[in-house]
Amino acid sequence: MLRGNCLSKTQRTGHGDTRKRLLEATEWLFIEGGYEAMSLRHITARAGANLAAVNYHFGSKEALMQELLSQRLDPLNRDRLQLLSACEQQHPEGLGAAAVLGMLFIPAFRLSHGNTCGPAFMRLLGRVYSDPSPFIRSYLQDHYRPISGRFFEAFSRALPALPRQELGLRLHFALKALSGMLAGEDMQELITSINKGETINDAELLARLISLLSPILTAPFGTPAQVKVIEQLLDLDRSTARTDLAADTGHIPGESAAPQWLKEGRLAS
């Protein structure tokens, strides 16, 4: 259940106009179950409204969702672009990948810190970037193409050795990893797990979070040494599977010597 958020306050007190209640109900249901699982019947029941109210204020479920995303994401993305522009002006020599990644985090973190709506907002971001609905994916691509392109170019300048296609793949996985964390956890629980019981400031907290994702962008990608390790593990897995199959059928083959690298307790190099 969503806790510590501002979405249910209107519903609990019965105050607020119908349009606001519909938006709040939509946000809550979207965070909890995603776009496809959310029906107008669910929205109106939670908002204490009727279908005629949705048609009057928005016209459709799609238009209602578009309004919610615009209200929540447009200010965030404006702040991200402003921060990126300011940093590029201060550092014309170039920015590192971790710094660019930080510019995606910091405005969102500010909105979640010291704000009763913050945990809900962070989970909304996680759901938006991980929801598989074609409608959500299409909306993000159509409405936020400029900011996506702006940050992609910033990452490309920070990582000039990466082919653009590979950079796109790495960014996709990095954002998916972040989305999974944000969509599935209470923000305070996530912070607690990162600070490991220590008293740390915001900069230290964000640095740790960014350090978890930065290797997705910067780690070597399928080097010959990495491929060799995986090939040896695959060979060992096939050998183990054959041994298990032989044991199940009552036919035990002769014992084969384990690879030297495995006896020594290390990965092959």
Q: What do the predicted segments below correspond to?
A:
Residues 99-103, 116-145, 186-187:
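Amphipathic alpha-helical segments used for helix-helix packing
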Residues 15, 19-27:
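Short, leucine-enriched amphipathic alpha-helices that occur as contiguous helical runs
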Residues 21, 29, 33-63, 67-71:
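Helix-turn-helix
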